[in-house]
């Protein structure tokens, strides 16, 4: 898998201006890899930012900035997008099949926190959807406090 490295600030700006298309572009080769890894019950490669996106500001890397969901509208667009919404639900369903493991066993500690943030964000956008099931199954129903604060502050 190739990871795009930003060589100039203009590169990052260009990708940010692409809207949710930036996720589709990133997933072109890596979605199948990510799904296969989750189906096997263990994340092994680097794709978390654009497969399970979270609210911008949670991470400090260029990838967490680039693939961070900027506001509620972008989160809604992501879920409503025919490709992205379908893929997020598909890989989330695959994750739920591993209810005999912890999120940390599947993702590792840091990425397990990112998934919790992602599920909290999308559960707030689409209550009653599959995302609450992940939070209940892997996180004892506990939501990401930072994400909830951002939503309450209307920054998402």
Question: Can you name each region flagged by the protein language model?
Answer:
Residues 57-63, 123-133:
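Short helix-capping/linker segments at secondary-structure and domain boundaries
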Residues 43-50, 87, 111-118, 130, ...:
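Residue-level detector of well-ordered alpha-helical segments, enriched
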Residues 127-156:
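Charged phosphate-binding loop/patch that engages nucleotide di/tri-phosphates or the phosphate backbone
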Residues 2-29, 146:
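Extreme N-terminal tail/first-helix region
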Residues 62, 67-86:
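Chitinase-like catalytic core of GlcNAc-active glycosidases
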Residues 77-123:
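Mid-chain, well-packed structural core segment of small domains
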Residues 27-39:
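A long, hydrophobic alpha-helical segment
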Residues 37-70:
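Hydrophobic/aromatic-rich, well-ordered segments within soluble, folded domains that form packed cores
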